[in-house]
């Protein structure tokens, strides 16, 4: 059985990874080949779309040095379903700027088959 702390740590690390090649490799290792992410009414299918979506979010939020991604440690599991809160933390003062509840459905190998992000604390106007 997959360790959910490892899943949450690896998931969070993907959003913080600044090297595009390492980030792509991490996405390929974490998501199933037919993995999908649903966020804010959008759907991102398979590796190329997932990599592009994460690269865009990284450039906008983390790559600028304004924020870093972190999970809250509130990990839960039921069978192949895993949930936890992911947050954007301000780099300067460590405040929570945004948060979402993540629900993951894992495949038999422990890779993400489905990823749902539901915003619970919207990002304030910048």
Can you say where each PLM-predicted feature lies in the sequence?
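Basic/polar N-terminal segments that are highly enriched at the extreme N-terminus
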Residues: 1-6, 122-126
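Short acidic-aromatic low-complexity motifs
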Residues: 2-33
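Polar/charged side chains located within well-ordered beta-strands of beta-rich proteins
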Residues: 11, 37, 115-117
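Hydrophobic pocket/interface hotspot
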Residues: 11, 27, 35, 50, ...
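Alpha-helix boundary/capping and short turn/kink residues
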Residues: 17-20, 40, 44, 94
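A solvent-exposed, acidic/Ser-Thr-rich amphipathic alpha-helical stretch
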Residues: 24-80
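A beta-strand edge to alpha-helix "cap/lid" segment located at domain peripheries
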Residues: 55-126
């Amino acid at each position: 059985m997959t360790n959910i702390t490892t899943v949450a740590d690896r998931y969070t690390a993907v959003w913080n990874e600044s090297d595009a090649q390492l980030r792509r490799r991490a996405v390929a290792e974490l998501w199933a080949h037919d993995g999908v992410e649903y966020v804010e009414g959008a759907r991102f299918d398979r590796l190329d779309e997932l990599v592009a979506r994460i690269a865009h979010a990284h450039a906008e939020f983390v790559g600028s040095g304004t924020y870093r991604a972190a999970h809250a440690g509130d990990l839960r599991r039921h069978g192949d379903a895993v949930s936890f809160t992911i947050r954007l933390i301000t780099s300067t003062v460590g405040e929570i700027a945004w948060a979402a509840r993540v629900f993951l459905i894992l495949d038999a190998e422990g890779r993400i088959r489905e990823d749902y992000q539901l915003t619970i604390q919207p990002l304030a106007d910048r």
